Amino acid sequence: MQFQEKEFLPVILGADITAYSLARSFHEEYGIKSLVLSMSEGGYIANSDIIENRIFPGLENKDVLVKHLIEVGKEFEGKKKLIVLGCGDWYVRALIESKKELSPYYIIPY
């Protein structure tokens, strides 16, 4: 499978069908691979070639989520624009509440 190199990278929170759907949409439109942050290896995103899944236990805790998002943000700082999307109300709420801490690293469309 051929992937395009773009100036942005979708960072998707969660491992459900919505995460897969978002990753697939980005892949179909831009030919890119999405980065998914999840708490598990299985589910709809397992073995997908269009997703890089990074597993972080404890993402249901907002402080843990923000910590890992900042780590990932620093990893790509100056290399790619990161667009973070939450799959589920809880993730979206956490992103909105943490916008100040995360906005140096991410585009947060909420």
Predicted feature locations:
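ATP-binding N-terminal substructure of ATP-dependent carboxylate-amine bond-forming enzymes
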Residues: M1-Y110
